[in-house]
From Swiss-Prot:
One GO term of the biological process aspect: hydrogen sulfide biosynthetic process
Protein name: Adenylyl-sulfate kinase
Listed pathway(s): Sulfur metabolism; hydrogen sulfide biosynthesis; sulfite from sulfate: step 2/3
NCBIfam families recorded: apsK, PRK03846.1
Pfam families the UniProt entry points to: APS_kinase
Taxonomic placement: Bacteria, Pseudomonadati, Pseudomonadota, Gammaproteobacteria, Alteromonadales
EC numbers for this chain: 2.7.1.25
Catalytic reactions of this protein: adenosine 5'-phosphosulfate + ATP = 3'-phosphoadenylyl sulfate + ADP + H(+)
Origin species: Shewanella baltica (strain OS185)
Coiled-coil portions: none
InterPro entries: APS_kinase, P-loop_NTPase
Function of the molecule: Catalyzes the synthesis of activated sulfate.
Keyword Nucleotide-binding: yes
Amino acid sequence: MTNIVWHQHPVDQAARAEQKGQNPVLLWFTGLSGAGKSTLAGALERALFEAGFHTYLLDGDNVRHGLCKDLGFTVEDRDENLRRVGEVAKLMVDAGLVVLSAFISPTREERDSIRARFPASQFIEVHVSTPLSVCEQRDPKGLYVKARSGEISNFTGISSPYEAPLAAELTIDTSKGDLATQVRALIDYLTAINVINADKAKALA
């Protein structure tokens, strides 16, 4: 690695962000399977996109069809899955995008490792805190049934622990209130920290 140096591009993150008229950021949605991470992140992305933002949503299932298709679900593979996603998200933020990532990401160490790649103002942890009982009742992919029967091992929330964030920037329980209200809470937060400026906030009203 000593012979590899970082090549400085003539166009930097600030220039890309200025061209797009937005402040790049990573919103990291974490929570149990079935908590509503992808639904919430997708609804927020749709609202931002329609208001003229340049966005991209990284989804836990989708990246395993390509970027991480060679990985399984051992502890080591799950760590590598998130390491890769964190690096991709960093590149996307450097490109000036508003990036949304929806991953169970069960350990604080994993999430903190990704947070450490970004300036404090560019990483927003969103804990989708929907209770296990609700997630299991929803069970959209039938995974909890398989986990309870022993067909799936190391399943987060059943046979493997989930470590809730200690200081997430936002906490949303999708079993309380409706999706529009939850998206509004996210938009209000992004406006308060100036990710969304006043002019674009009007388009999201």
